[in-house]
């Protein structure tokens, strides 16, 4: 199982990975502040943050869970736990 992933946002502080996203962009949420969600794209020397609505983040996380279940992924329990802690 892979370890948790964190990033530091210049304004909102620590973010943790909620779900992998599409096109190399992952979904992160604020760790300490009010729940805000970001679509994060990491390129060679730059990190791009795009604020996304709660329902979009939840939908993407649900799609990731379905994909992990279909594939029988070893990380399924990790994503289920993160989904429960973040959205339920």
Which residues make up each language-model segment?
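Short intrinsically disordered terminal tails
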Residues: 1-3, 74-77, 83-88
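A short beta-strand micro-motif
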Residues: 5-9
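Acidic, low-complexity, intrinsically disordered interaction modules
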Residues: 11-71
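Short, aromatic- and cysteine-enriched interfacial helices/patches
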Residues: 12, 39, 82, 86-88
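Ubiquitous "structural anchor" signal
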Residues: 20-21, 32, 80-81, 87-88
